[in-house]
Design a protein with these regions (language model features):
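Alpha/beta-hydrolase active-site loop
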Residues: 59-75
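The serine-hydrolase catalytic nucleophile loop
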Residues: 19-32, 189
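Short beta-strand/loop motif that positions the catalytic acidic residue
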Residues: 170-171, 177-179, 183
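Acidic catalytic loop of the alpha/beta-hydrolase fold
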Residues: 182-186, 213-214
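Conserved alpha/beta-hydrolase
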Residues: 32-54
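Short alpha-helix in the alpha/beta-hydrolase fold that links the catalytic acid
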Residues: 28, 173, 187-196, 220
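Catalytic histidine-centered segment of alpha/beta-hydrolase-like enzymes
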Residues: 211-223
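Hydrolase active-site cap/lid region
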Residues: 103-150
Length: 240
């Protein structure tokens, strides 16, 4: 697993990226720079089959990528962490926090997409596409961001064992969710459903009326920095 770690004080921050993205993205870089100015520790990494990490993207599953995140928490961090998850990373963040609750002092979800393999991909495919996936094992899905993305039968089937939005999510740490209302990949009301599903009483959800899925332009990055700063301050206040 390729990673970049900036040493610093606690709580640390661990950034978990999206489906087929990598740790060099705009949000990861902007938040790393901000957290460094704040003197907190920061880790960003690539899941297997992503970016600079080994493996093939089409071999990946939600279980594999969540294990990658847990491994990063175990090997590269100590003490309380604020987990930041973008898109699919929001699902990975929740799974990692459930696996290592002592590490998860807070969470910041950016267009968080828990259960997206089932409720966004599979639910959005027509019968012919579903048949192709079941028969051929893969569907090359067109992407707005570059080459088609291989959506595999394993990704869909294995993802079903990690679905979180069917019941209460037993996490009690503070959570901040940021969601654009012009997001064409994650419906904005998904953030409200996640707010309801989380057991935590300390959940704040920010809807950005003109925000898209990426939330990577200047004003959006300012909002992310502001929310992360508030959350880190809150966690630091609780810890002292």
């Amino acid at each position: 697993i390729a990673y970049h770690r900036t040493p610093g004080r606690l709580p640390g921050v661990v950034f978990m990226g999206g489906f087929a993205s990598d740790m060099t993205g705009t949000k990861a870089a902007a938040l790393e720079s901000f957290v460094r100015q704040r003197s907190n520790a920061f880790v960003r990494f690539d899941y297997q089959g992503h970016g600079q990490s080994s493996g093939h993207f089409r071999d990946g599953t939600i279980g594999q990528w969540s294990r990658d995140a847990v491994h990063v928490l175990d090997a590269l961090t100590e003490g309380p962490q604020v987990l930041v998850g973008s898109s699919m990373g929001g699902w990975i963040m929740l799974l990692a926090a459930l696996a290592r609750p002592a590490h998860a002092a807070g969470m910041l979800g950016i267009a968080a997409a828990p259960d997206f393999t089932e409720d966004m991909l599979w639910a959005g495919f027509d019968a012919a596409t579903r048949e192709r996936i079941e028969r051929d094992g893969v569907y090359e899905m067109p992407s707005d961001y570059g080459a088609p993305l291989p959506i595999t039968r394993d990704l869909i089937h294995e993802g079903r064992s990690h679905l979180l939005m069917r019941g209460t999510i037993p996490l009690t740490c503070p959570v901040r969710l940021i969601q654009g209302m012009q997001d064409d990949e994650v419906p904005w009301d998904w953030a409200l459903k996640l707010t309801e599903r989380l057991q935590s009483e300390d959940v704040e959800t920010v809807l950005i009326k003109h925000g898209d899925h990426r939330l990577s332009d200047g004003p959006d990055l300012d909002r992310l920095r502001y929310q992360l700063d508030r959350l880190l301050g809150h966690v630091e206040g609780v810890a002292t």
